[in-house]
Amino acid sequence: MTLVSKTFELYGKTYTFESGELAKQATGACLVKQGDTTMLDTVVVSKERKNYDFFPLTVDFNEKMYAAGRIPGGYLKREGRPSEKATLTARMIDRPIRPSFPDGFRNEVHIVATSLVADQVNPFDVINVMGASLAMTLGVVPFEGPLACVRIGRNVETGEFIVNPTYEERENSDLDLELGGSADFISMVEAGAEEISEDDMLAAMKFGQEALAAFCQAQDEFVAEWEQVNGPIVKKEYPLDQPVEEVQERIFAHYDEMAAALRDADKLSRIGKVEALKESIRAEFTEEEQAAWEREIPVALKKLEKKAMRTMVVETGERVDGRAADEIRPIMVKDNYLPLVHGSGLFQRGQTQVLSVLSLGMLNEGQRLDTIEPTEGKRYMHHYNFPPFCTGETGRMGSPKRREIGHGNLAERALLPVLPDENEFPYAIRVVSEVMESNGSSSMASTCGSTLALMDGGVPIKRPVSGIAMGLIQEEGKTVVLSDIQGLEDFLGDMDFKVTGTTEGITALQMDNKATGLTFDILARALQQAKEGRAFILQKMLDVIPEPRHTTRSTAPRIVSIQVPTDKIRDVIGSGGKVIRGIQDETGASVDIQEDGTVFVGGTGESVDQAVERIKLIIKVPEPGEEYTGRVVSIQPFGAFVNLLPGKDGLLHISRVAKGRVEKVEDVLNVGDEVKVVVIEVDDRGKISLDRLDKPEAPARAEGSSEGDGEHFQRRERPRRERSERSDRPRRPGDNGGRKPRRHHDAE
């Protein structure tokens, strides 16, 4: 195998594909670069087919901190549990690739994306789909390719779309749209947006489809060059689970029974009826037939259920729960659901129920991110939990799974555009959405529940956000767009298209599509139908809580911000943090200082006011004419130093400590005495001169002492040594007895 490398320019960016040098024992491997960002994508396919009734695909993103020149945090100092970004990247790679494999493929497939270089300029996530696509192509894996993924941004100043924007370009973009698919087919969409219109979103998707085609063509060119160097790629045959005609005929004879079993609005009741029917159908096969067709019978039963559900929708216009295509399930909304917490909301739509709970904290309680991205942290966090009881099942509880992380991220992106700026609302914000019941669209219920919790907690969001999940059925040449899909319609349908937004526009999108016949006209219809559904749901929410509460809960921390001159930051912090720790210990408030001098003070009760007052005193510069009651902290022969404010001392000169002449400051003042003073001068170096208010009379002096009345005071004569005594000591070189050397002048 000979190394092949090809570099090309697309949409103002440089890309490189390489293969033939690294990971040669994998089924396929490809190195892909954007700028200096370098990713290695590998694929391994098991030699034996597994006895599964599903496609066993696993995608891992191997985030290496050395790619960004960093050492991992933590005690072990090595990579461990995947970060949230790594999990989301793995999902991004998985979603466009999974539907590209043929039905019945049961060999295990493992795709691993490894970060080798993260140049902090070009994002590393979307290019992995191209790398995985090329690895599968070169490894002769059976899939519908080539595939690509692109990110589309939009410059807020010019309105121009940008393909795969840099981190800097993303900062100036009101759209973050990720599209995955082939040259003529979009299978995955993930987006966050600053309330943009449906028309603008559709235009961005069309532009992205053109970019997908360009990147797929670049892959074809690389493969052609590879074959010129290494010879033609020979197609491999993998066994597929194929339906047995006899099994299908016998099972599909029960079509009417399946259609009847599916007609039930209650999820658990419907599942019970369908499973009972499947068992009765399975019992019609002999033990020998069941053993021979162990894999074929479950597949055929699933196809029967799918066919009955889909045909019902396209032929009658009625869904399994009796709703019309654009009808939304009954909605129940409650705010202020839990006492004492900082905010809460309960949102129920049909048999999907989510309780969202708000927690507020200091900004330094936000999440710090230890990733290879330049992003250091985030202030708003949304966490989505999907316990087994929400579907009436048993199971293990533990760390969040990939699906929970993905759904939580979607609801997080949905609310980000409407959150207040941290200068307006200086809090770290966490919302946890607990799924109490689930029958589809739980992520959209989490979005609605998060809005309720934020408004209930007094977070001044710009506009409330609602969300809806749209579906698609394409059967027998007919197309039906479904609003507010439930679990069965998601599982057996062709599309899961989630849309969130406000009255002003879209804030987030997520789509997984299996229908090759999806057109932009259908997408436009789905977006418009989603807009109408979002408005209906939003009104139900506003009927309960029309606007955010004007104040936060009494149980929430109170946070205020003050501005400190940057040259005073060290005064507030103190040596080794001594001053700021003292403020926090003595007041009970939390203090967080930013590099620009913004200080956030948080706490409960009077602790915030006390801490703010302490900080103001530290940064205050005394002005001439201001009066203080200070404490004497030091006495010198020339005067006393009086502490006016924390870290601010002024000099009370000896001539100003009392009326009349004072020989020694200690005769009038002692360390620790309180004294009323007035500032008379602050020089250019910040030195403060004081005068004493209500000066006392200077103490009377003993007889013979000078009181400044003109009398001469007699010095006590000290015994004088004879010169001979002084001359006895040895003279040092250059010693002139303390006298300056006499200068000799030449006579003129």
Residue ranges and their predicted role:
Residues 557-559, 566-748:
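Single-stranded RNA-binding regions, centering on S1/OB-family and related RNA-binding modules
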Residues 28-30, 122-140, 335-358, 439-459, ...:
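Conserved phosphate/anionic-ligand binding catalytic regions in large, soluble enzymes, centered on
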Residues 233-242, 536-562, 608-629:
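Long, charged amphipathic helices and adjacent flexible linkers at domain junctions
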Residues 1-235:
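Long, basic N-terminal domains or extensions that often function
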